[in-house]
Amino acid sequence: MLLPWLILIPFIGGFLCWQTERFGVKVPRWIALVTMGLTLALSLQLWLQGGYSLTQSAGIPQWQSEFDMPWIPRFGISIHLAIDGLSLLMVVLTGLLGVLAVLCSWKEIEKYQGFFHLNLMWILGGVIGVFLAIDMFLFFFFWEMMLVPMYFLIALWGHKASDGKTRITAATKFFIYTQASGLVMLIAIQALVFVHYNATGVWTFNYEELLNTPMSNGVEYLLMLGFFSAFAVKMPVVPLHGWLPDAHSQAPTAGSVDRAGILLKTAAYGLLRFSLPLFPNASAEFAPIAMWLGVIGIFYGAWMAFAQTDIKRLIAYTSVSHMGFVLIAIYTGSQLAYQGAVIQMIAHGLSAAGLFILCGQLYERIHTRDMRMMGGLWSKMKWLPALSLFFAVATLGMPGTGNFVGEFMILFGSFQVVPVITVISTFGLVFASVYSLAMLHRAYFGKAKSQIASQELPGMSLRELFMILLLVVLLVLLGFYPQPILDTSHSAIGNIQQWFVNSVTTTRP
């Protein structure tokens, strides 16, 4: 019964934030913080209950906890929520970054506090819904629900970019990209349900029943492309990444933390949970194309990051590069690479959130994100430059951080399957060090390039230090002791991999 509350609490909390603004501007902040703290506590409670090592020999999903309530029985639509090791880890990450998103916007947001926190909470509620829903109609409902509050977050509280683009442009671009790709996925879901009805005479949107839908190879390939296009835009996969740099550079810090830390993960989760198991033969056929798109993403993201002058755009392009590794891992069919992808998703969520929070703190002090206006900041403020150095080396995959474990497992697992692609993508790690160190050099070293950068700047407050040090501790823990994460996700990932490999090697039921 905990599962519906994981989704309801952020929605109820968001509504309360909106309504209580009249009692004072600080009230919505505290309600939002308590709401996300409660969501995180509930998800940790589910984790402590255990039961994530369940496996069935057939590779059919095995859920630790399930909630099923009829919604529209005529079409087989129900409010069907379930959790296993993979979705649990994503929900915990959402809860954690939700708390940090509220904390990092504590001083940044001054107007419409209640409506801001309503949008923030509803995004997080929608994301948790995506991770828990296993009714395809409900999944699509939550998938689309995330978009509207994110649009408002960028359009109302965004910053003007250093190249003069407006926040409305960025918000509209984000909305059109994701809405259009979501529409393609809706058509694919409806087609899948119709194909299943033609074969069995039963209307259903239930994921477990749709897994056994008999269909021809051509139909399977078309439906798989429908799902892949929606996930590829959100991930993002080059060349469908056009919305990301603008949306990141104009969004408020909380929006960037949520998008890089959580929203991009919904796409990787969707590929693992839905695209591979529902369309195994088509996915296996499409795998070489997907993996080469991942390789292109790794290098394109790295080159574009190096060329940026806006520090937030630079970090946005690093996400394109890092998610390229995850895309390669997903299509290898290797258990080790899948486990690496899960670690990489969590580590990237933590390190990208850290970089965006530090960017926000830097912006509050010098009121620019243009690295051409920075320089020489290392000696001008305490803590912030050194912590930026930590997150920069974490991003480039330094041993001792979670990013290294994730990338190493992905490359090690992929090498057994696609050695050429693995060797080429390894060079992407070299470029990662180039853009990470270039960012540090331009912002913190050399001579001060503007009046603001040459002044003494205030250090970090306890709130700012707490957020960043928490992320540092978690990244180092993940780097030295990833075993709890691997144990939790092992069974769920094993089921997905087994179903995928068995369906490809045998004929589809």
Language-model segment annotations:
Residues 50-78, 163-171, 182-241, 271, ...:
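Juxtamembrane/interfacial segments at transmembrane-helix boundaries in multi-pass membrane proteins
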Residues 1-9, 83-94, 137-149, 220-231, ...:
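Structural signature of hydrophobic alpha-helical transmembrane segments
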Residues 238, 352-355, 422-456:
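Predominantly late transmembrane helices and immediately cytosolic-facing juxtamembrane segments
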Residues 14-19, 44, 102-103, 125-129, ...:
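Alpha-helical transmembrane segments of multipass membrane proteins
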Residues 15-22, 98-110, 152-166, 234-249, ...:
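C-terminal ends of transmembrane helices
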Residues 4-19, 34-46, 91-105, 123-124, ...:
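Central hydrophobic cores of alpha-helical transmembrane segments in multi-pass inner-membrane proteins
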Residues 23-25, 118, 122, 126-215, ...:
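Alpha-helical multi-pass transmembrane bundles of energy-transducing inner-membrane proteins
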Residues 1-2, 16-118, 199, 204, ...:
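Transmembrane helix-loop-helix hairpins at membrane boundaries of multipass inner-membrane proteins
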